[in-house]
Amino acid sequence: MSGRGSFRFVLLLVLLASCSLPRPTVGLAINGTTVQGSREGSYCQTGGCSGVCADSLAPTAPLTALRAPAPVRLDFSTGAEVNQIHGDIWRGDAMNGQPLESFELRGTERSYTSQQMRGGRYYLLVSLGWSRVTDRGDTSVAFLIELTPP
């Protein structure tokens, strides 16, 4: 195979591999405690290889009980390709009525301090926006937290 043919073959392999990249995920920690997230909720992913969207009901998240002082700091962990994190916080087990609080993190911001969360149960729906060379999109994950003051 010639040098030019080898280059094209390698380029084709790189493009095919990049078409199968998974959507980014997000982790959440509060006061050093990892909060378990739900399965992936609604998402859209578009790029040079294909485009796909799926809508679902609001994800059900497992309950994580923890102690944390107010104000509560939410620390997110995710890949560098994520350039937007949007969160809505409801008091209780699910999305009922208007969110108690909403926030937007852009670029490399990965922490948010809630002024509303105190003792009690909270449902968080977190949406990620990302952009890579080969694709872009958004996805969502839910968290369910029971906070107890220290």
Where are these regions (language model features)?
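Short beta-strand segments within Ig-like beta-sandwich modules, predominantly Fibronectin type-III
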Residues: 101-108
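C-terminal motif of bacterial Sec signal peptides marking the signal peptidase cleavage site
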Residues: 16-18
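Transition segment at domain starts
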Residues: 20-61
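Mature extracytoplasmic domains of secretory-pathway proteins
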Residues: 44-46, 51-98
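Short acidic/polar inter-strand loop motif in beta-rich domains
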Residues: 130-138
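Sec-dependent signal peptide recognition
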Residues: 4-12
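Surface-exposed, short loops/turns at beta-strand junctions within beta-sandwich domains
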Residues: 114-122
